[in-house]
A protein has these predicted regions:
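Short coil/linker segments at helix-helix boundaries
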Residues: 48-168, 172, 176, 181-189, ...
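Residue signature of alpha-solenoid helical repeat architecture, marking inter-repeat boundaries
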Residues: 36, 41-43, 141, 145-149, ...
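Acidic, serine/threonine- and glycine-rich low-complexity intrinsically disordered segments
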Residues: 179-247
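Short N-terminal segments immediately surrounding and downstream of signal-peptide cleavage
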Residues: 13-31
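Structural recognition of alpha-solenoid helical scaffolds
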Residues: 18, 22, 150-157, 193, ...
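Alpha-helical, heptad-rich or low-complexity scaffold/stalk segments
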Residues: 29-32, 38-51, 55
Length: 247
């Protein structure tokens, strides 16, 4: 087992009050009679909300050593033994996230986010990007940069949620990752994300019964059909297998 080195505890490096103040300032700016008419104000709001979404898991990734985790995120509030996908794991518990580590190597296996700085951060960022582009298409390059960063983070979170067994939430995360890339023309939508969302929603539907199952299967079907209408097809054709199960 890897050696645990836990010096005097310090909090996860997320300054919640500071981040909330940034969001409040961005909200106030777009509500201002003059500043709200500027696309740049909406770009800034999109950036603030995207950054707040990303921050709690910004330094995480599978295979990162515990020592690097502690250096970048801080020391955990505590640690305990658990399991990850049925295998032994050591959990480093932080304010915003529980990080699962391989006991043999000390490498990150996965994580589960427990808190968000604010609700609907990614969705608000996407809405703000769309508003900014509507007001001034010349802001496209700035918007595209935010959209790509946010989409990558959402897809990574989708993987993390799926690894923890949160299938429906993972599906939504992949769908939002796809939507982030549809705001401006220069970001090419990743239909793999849409396929992942449909696949996960179909898997989730199979665990339900009655009207809930019907609604979830219908949602999966819609996602698959949207992907197919764009000309998308996964490498081995599994999209048709999952689509069949939606009927």
């Amino acid at each position: 087992m890897f050696a645990l080195a836990l010096p005097a505890a310090n909090a996860q490096k997320v300054a919640t009050a500071k981040e909330l103040a940034k969001l409040e300032k961005a909200d106030a700016t777009v509500l201002d009679a003059k500043k709200g008419l500027k696309a740049s104000s909406w770009v800034a709001r999109a950036n603030a909300y995207a950054n707040a979404y990303i921050l709690p898991t910004k330094e995480l990734g599978q295979g990162i050593p515990a020592q690097v985790l502690q250096m970048n995120v801080g020391n955990p509030e505590g640690s305990y033994e658990s399991t990850f996908q049925g295998m032994p794991s050591i959990v480093f518990s932080y304010e915003y996230v529980d990080v699962y580590l391989d006991p043999a190597t000390g490498f990150i296996q996965g994580w589960e986010q427990k808190l968000a700085i604010k609700e609907n951060l990614a969705e608000t960022a996407i809405e703000s990007m769309a508003k900014a582009y509507e007001m001034d298409p010349k802001q496209e390059s700035k918007i595209a940069s935010i959209a790509l960063t946010l989409s990558n983070a959402l897809a990574q979170q989708g993987d993390a949620l799926n690894n923890m067994g949160h299938t429906a939430e993972a599906a939504q995360s992949f769908l939002t990752a796809f939507q982030a890339l549809t705001v401006v023309p220069s970001t090419t939508p990743n239909f793999d994300y849409l396929y992942n969302a449909g696949m996960l929603m179909t898997m989730y539907a199979s665990t339900l019964q009655g009207d809930e199952a019907v609604a979830a299967f219908n949602a999966g079907e819609q996602l698959f059909n949207t992907a197919l209408a764009s000309g998308y097809e996964d490498a081995v054709g599994n999209i048709y297998y999952f689509l069949f199960h939606c009927y």
